[in-house]
């Protein structure tokens, strides 16, 4: 609510004797009065809260991925064995399936983990036959390659897949040294001073590759403006390929609204973390917070 209302212009018809202001605009001038802002945020928050359940229940699923239904080649027979074990476990413990899953997939390079993960996620889905998850990679340069692999190896269409590509260097997952933190904070403060309220910053700066599809009407009501389509695709597409730092914003953001999209995505989406052994112990602490969420 705060993020959306902060992007709006001042209400010229707002009547108030209050001399306190809530934020500034890009021109560094005072914008919304405090009481105007608080009332607007409350109204917007109430409206959005009524949609939260729909973010979980009305997002898109990939159903007919034919390759995942087929038997794996002999050298990758372990993929089907993993799926069979999951199916057997679910059949034997049907009364406890409301709980979450924590699965570790260990296999050597070239043994087919990419397709195996997709098969496993399909087996773990609520109906056992669909896909909806985030594939979080360790290296940004792999996102396009993995997106291509999903398109070609799994036969997934552009309407089922979104690939998030960053334009800047991969950020460290855990907090950097104190001196670097201070320098970064000063840069952020300068940026906020230049562009106005931190709540009005973009939710998703990076480029997102996706094909436009019809979105639920409620998403068009929640996300407005020139970046609405990108935000909607980030949330709506059945499979999202990105680097893990994009999802880390859900737990590591301390100011601004960068946590909003990854948090909403995780309401309805499973999470696959690729090559987790590439991360150092400090990174794993931050990853643990993400898994716990």
Q: Predicted regions span which residues?
A:
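N-terminal accessory nucleic-acid engagement/regulatory domains that precede
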Residues: 1-68
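Walker A/P-loop
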Residues: 97-120, 279-280
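Pre-Walker A (Motif I) flank of P-loop NTPase domains
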Residues: 97-104, 130-132, 236-238
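A substrate-engagement module of RecA-like helicase motors
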Residues: 151-238, 244-246
